[in-house]
Amino acid sequence: MAKPLTLPSAASLPAVLLEQAARQGRRVALRHKRLGVWRERSWAELADEVGRLAAALAGLGLGPGQRLLALTPPRPQTALLSLAAHWLGAEVAALDPALPAEALSGLIAAAQPTVTLIDGPAQRAVTLAALGEAAPVIYLDARREPQAGGPAGRAYAELLAGQALPPALAATPEQTAFRFFRWGEHGGLETQALSHAFLLQEGGERVRAHGLSADERALAARAFATAEQARHLFAPWLLAGFSLNFPENLATRDQDRRELGPTLVAGTRETYGRLADDVARRLPPPGHWQRRLVDWALSGQGGAPGRALGYWLVRRPLLDVLGLIHTRHPLLLGPPLPAAQAEWFARLGVRLHALPDVARWQEASAPATAARPFVTSAGA
């Protein structure tokens, strides 16, 4: 097990990346499943790629006080480009691409990005509608975008092809690392800014509270589109130096979780609710003898012999189906699960660690181009 990381005096997220590359450069930092194969990058390779991306982003005009907008599903390139933007002293705004188009378009316009990172035609359409044709865009996969080579478009692979040396690290602890946008309950724009210092403090507390080490395997099955993901997954990954693993796509995330066997899962109410519903569909109907066996095994009756038998006959196979058989740190980000689902996981032996959103959202003025989504009045 690696020794705890000693933070640099001027700590920032990319500074911690460089520290990990220096102390455990050959260790796996990131995995991504592509075309059915898990591909790995070491900490040293990650630091080199982030440095080259920083040079490329500087060439696109990104710098201190400016903003990269990430509008992608879970992708390793998003994590690397975020760190590259931080390297330059810029901040990253992350939005969930699954939001309704009307709400998403307004948030994109409100973010006023210098550069936008997108993944496919749907994101391209909503970005162009919100920002116009001249807005600089980075495409994760140019093969999916015939127009990626336009005057305002760059492919991710193009950014890595340059030979420019990495610029000097410009990030400082007090700078904003991530900024999040949302529409409030009454239709007003709200923002939340997280500095490098805050994220490293929160991430350090998470590492200590859960005893996280470089031996963890974490699954990043959601985009970094929430403050909870940045606080409880992104920052701890850099600080503890464990491996961050990305599924091939959202459709394969459950199968990829079973293959990977993560020790750390940072999921939301929707994540764990989906898993509970999936297993419920596989169980025998109530009243069937096999269902009675399942219920008995989950009850923990029969003393130590009964609990051991129930584990091997029922709980272990169910945990294997869920891909949680090796999970020591199941984190629940945001709102809690319904009581029945929380109790069901507890009976399986999965003790969810609830981490609610305690950060404060602040009202902000939306630019004229940021159309608010329609919101009904309280009395409607």
Protein language model regions, located:
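N-lobe entry segment of adenylate-forming
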Residues: M1-R41, E45-L60, E145, P167-A170, ...
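Conserved AMP-binding/adenylate-forming core of the ANL superfamily
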Residues: L30-G61, Q66-R75, P100-S105, T191-F198
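Conserved adenylate-forming
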Residues: L60-L62, P166-E174, R179-A221, E228, ...
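Short beta-strand->loop structural element characteristic of the AMP-binding/adenylate-forming
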Residues: L69-L71, T78, S82, H86-L117, ...
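Conserved ATP-dependent adenylate/AMP-binding module captured primarily in the ANL superfamily
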Residues: P97-A129, E202-L219, L250-L264, V321-G323
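ANL superfamily adenylate-forming
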Residues: R124-Q175, R179, W183-L189, A197-G203, ...
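Gly/Ser/Thr-rich phosphate-binding loop
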Residues: A157, A266, D278-A380
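Conserved AMP-binding/adenylation subdomain of ANL enzymes
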Residues: L200-R217, F224-G302, G306-R315, R351
